[in-house]
């Protein structure tokens, strides 16, 4: 069975379990156990840590994936890996020193709205360092095509850690201060796990020396770092701008809608863990026919699986919001239902273009990545300003959808022009028809007046309808092969 199918299937399961646990943490455990004030503190500090983390890693985890397969000798490969460990220290050490020397000033600045934040800002630097090195060691695993354990640590472990700490807090075994201490400890324990695992797969010779292509590696890292900034703007700018333009509760409704649609990305996140290094290796070997094959397969399989998830979500959206109302007793969340539809369309557009981002970022045209990223960030900001004013907070979702579809089309066109390859086949039309027809059939179908029963039964019917058509029309040869092998094993 294909290595991609094996690991992608395992990674999808991990991400789905992680998403379920994350949903419980976000919608129920956090608010009811730790309270909204402390919950807000954790969210703010972890968000700030996530902003700093890319500065610390400086895109070197992506450089490992791009350049590791481009060199033949173990000596040169080892130089790249050691560089990825040492280089972040030139950023981490001075920033950490500045942070410590100006601790009170930074604390006062960050705690203007909530004075309690000042007491816990050590979380920002501590977790940023841990996460930066986790990503670097995880990239070591990816280039060896071993992604499942790292994906488990990245997606499921941290959510499980939060759940355990919340219950320790609930049973009064720890207070909030020790909650933060154990949170940091848990992140560093995760780093130790991935470090030992990556070294068990591939152990470099720990001798400090400079790779032959040092300039190219650092230049690539810089460009990826800049593009990461643009990507983070697209992710966070909606909520940030809405916070200035609409009421706080509207922002909360918007964030929950975004959270619901996040699961549509799970197949992409799972697939690209293993696909990125394979695309890099294929490009380094100049194997364009294989690259086109990866391109087409990633497009059709991602569209098929992401389409299935989007049909489940969009067809059951009323029941999903009924569940949210039961947990929170706030019916206002329903006004964000259109956000779910717009963001779902944008995510399906990203699934449709498959591994186009991997192709561009791992090719000699990687210098265009910051252009696409920063241009899309600027465009979404201007569209937000215009559309939020015209149609309210829904305008933020519309602008996101427009920008993602537009720039996916531009990237698709760029790859077609430069590589003479495209990701579509006749199966693409069949899959799109399958997604649209299933949505039309099940969206207005009500089987029971009890929303939980209705939700479960519709999910079952959608699963059997969608999977049966997929199997008998052979829309995914990889998925059919996987099912046949599993059937034979039984």
Predicted segment positions?
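Hydrophobic alpha-helical transmembrane segments
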Residues: 153-167, 172-200, 220, 374-379, ...
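Interhelical loop/hinge segments that connect adjacent transmembrane helices in multipass membrane
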Residues: 1-4, 116, 176-182, 192-235, ...
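Membrane-proximal transmembrane or re-entrant/amphipathic helices at the cytosolic face
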Residues: 443-490
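Transmembrane helical elements of multi-pass membrane transporters/channels
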Residues: 7-23, 182-198, 211-281, 301-302, ...
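Membrane-interface junctions at transmembrane-helix termini in multi-pass inner-membrane proteins
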Residues: 5, 130-156, 341-375, 415-417
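Signature of the first transmembrane helix
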Residues: 3-62, 91-100, 127, 219-249
